[in-house]
């Protein structure tokens, strides 16, 4: 028997054999079971995800001799002929090779005839988006009202190219691209059934290279079996796909984490010798960094495909802080984005890794070295005249004080003091220009620079060669920190001050509000008759009264509790007793009941009523309406104030 490729040999024969696409299979199975069968189905999705296979399974379910079912028997003549591709009532058409309108018309001429053997005549049109505009127009009427014995199954990888009139006449099912784990699991199942030796990491590489297409994965598996001499090995798959193996990619990550630039460049040279795809190199490193981050979150995230490098991955996850992983990941991701703009792909990868090394948080930072400067001894007298004799030999050194100054420092300070004295004497004796002319010139700027350097050296003593410690790495602590929220300072801008002043009530308006509050609130009227200090009066204005016989209870707002004290209660009780003519027992409790208003709340309510009336009056004003209508003026309602 001739060899059959895996993609054809393992084509699904039942709905249960289809990998993924549960959302499509469930809808089709329910429709077949309930007998709710549409006359046109459209399957869309990327290549190799099962569009044609599902369409054939649907045709098998429609024409199985056991009846319309979601689980065809697979043994009757109709099922076997559909599997073998020779069922007379399943007409498969490649629209890419039959795009002319004449081909479509010839096809539609046979639609009216009943099926020869099956229950339905099924037209399976693959790559239907390749049909011409005239072909779509010819198909339109038949697709809208086909005979009862005709079903259309359309498959396309580009549904956007189909006319909306075609889309509206079909049930649309979009097949999703398979994820890497689904493809890897199916490859493992097939290779186990075929008794072919394989490595988990090799299957992971094949599943990732398939990019969501199971057919591409099976084709690559056939190629890997041929490359690996009858088995699927990681080395053969890496060489076939032009990708790095785990050890090399992981070694690059380790060298980058250790800030070992020489090791990184050596590994780059090894990768170049293998002729790998440079973007694939960055993708592999990004994948490893992602796995390391996932292991830090959940130790069980490392799958069986990483068994060969599991220990090294867990060690990296243990030692690298999460912030470093995010830094490396973002650096490599940006490098991959900028790779097309690099003069050379290898150059772009090298610069990306060098950027990661440059931003390494543990790079050694050498301490700044202060150069040790030595100065020649300066004589105490900085200004010499020609009549002076040569300096005498220095006397024996005296005993140093308790806190000695450096010799150079003391000499420079003495020279500066002598210079100041000489300058003062020169100003006083301007009548002796001859002696000043014969004197040796003094470099004032040099002495000032020397003194400033000496002051800095004195303020920060230079460690000796024996005490100088080697350069230390930057202190880098990996610990969770909660940033202290800084309080936003309130800045009083002129605009804010103006707005606040606009809301201030004028004395006339405040008096008018108080008078109207007295008319509406008996307690406000009673407070106006009391002779109280201003601070005690605020207690009464911020409370509402509850009275029974000679007992008065004031319900004070909690925001004004600071006004409530024994002295205020005593003065308020005396004023109430004097007004009533008998002794009043006063109690004050805190109460924020909004149903009862205090005198101040009455004033605010009256103010808001007047403000609403003023706003309505201005809006209804004829002059204002004319300005807004003819000059497109805008009314600033926030500036409206009652008078």
Swiss-Prot record:
Annotated positions binding ATP: 45-52
Effect of residue 601 to K: In dnaX36(Ts); present only in isoform tau, unable to grow at 42 degrees Celsius
SUPFAM superfamilies for the chain: P-loop containing nucleoside triphosphate hydrolases, post-AAA+ oligomerization domain-like
Listed InterPro entries: AAA+_ATPase (IPR003593), ClpA/B (IPR001270), DNA_pol3_clamp-load_cplx_C (IPR008921), DNA_pol3_tau_IV (IPR022001), DNA_pol_III_gamma-3 (IPR022754), DNA_pol_III_sug/sutau_N (IPR012763), DNA_pol_III_tau_dom-5 (IPR021029), DNA_Rep/Repair_Clamp_Loader (IPR050238)
Region spans: Disordered: 385-404
Binding-site positions, Zn(2+): 64, 73, 76, 79
Cellular component aspect of the GO annotation: DNA polymerase III complex; DNA polymerase III, clamp loader complex; replisome
GO molecular function, one term: ATP hydrolysis activity
Gene Ontology biological process: DNA replication; DNA-templated DNA replication; viral translational frameshifting
Pfam families, A to Z: DNA_pol3_delta2, DNA_pol3_gamma3, DNA_pol3_tau_4, DNA_pol3_tau_5, DNAX_ATPase_lid
Catalytic reaction list: DNA(n) + a 2'-deoxyribonucleoside 5'-triphosphate = DNA(n+1) + diphosphate
Assigned EC number: 2.7.7.7
Record's keyword terms, sorted: ATP-binding, DNA replication, DNA-directed DNA polymerase, Metal-binding, Nucleotide-binding, Nucleotidyltransferase, Transferase, Zinc
Keyword Metal-binding part of the UniProt annotation: yes
Physiological role: Part of the beta sliding clamp loading complex, which hydrolyzes ATP to load the beta clamp onto primed DNA to form the DNA replication pre-initiation complex. DNA polymerase III is a complex, multichain enzyme responsible for most of the replicative synthesis in bacteria. This DNA polymerase also exhibits 3'-5' exonuclease activity. The gamma complex (gamma(3),delta,delta') is thought to load beta dimers onto DNA by binding ATP which alters the complex's conformation so it can bind beta sliding clamp dimers and open them at one interface.
NCBIfam families in UniProt: dnaX_nterm (TIGR02397), PRK05563.1 (NF004046), PRK07994.1 (NF005942)
Recorded family membership: Belongs to the DnaX/STICHEL family.
Known partners and oligomeric status: The DNA polymerase III holoenzyme complex contains at least 10 different subunits organized into 3 functionally essential subassemblies: the Pol III core, the beta sliding clamp processivity factor and the clamp-loading complex. The Pol III core (subunits alpha, epsilon and theta) contains the polymerase and the 3'-5' exonuclease proofreading activities. The polymerase is tethered to the template via the dimeric beta sliding clamp processivity factor.
Name of the protein: DNA polymerase III subunit tau
Species of the source: Escherichia coli (strain K12)
